[in-house]
């Protein structure tokens, strides 16, 4: 479980 991946999906959602 990597937090970086979570932020990656969060940025997409934000877009």
Swiss-Prot record:
Keyword Ligase assigned: no
Main location: secreted
Superkingdom, natural source: Bacteria
Keywords linked to the UniProt accession: Antibiotic, Antimicrobial, Bacteriocin, Secreted
Location of the protein in the cell: Secreted
Coiled-coil regions listed in the entry: none
Protein name according to UniProt: Bacteriocin BAC-IB17
Lineage: Bacteria, Bacillati, Bacillota, Bacilli, Bacillales
């Amino acid at each position: 479980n990597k937090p970086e991946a979570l932020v990656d999906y969060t940025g997409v959602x934000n877009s």
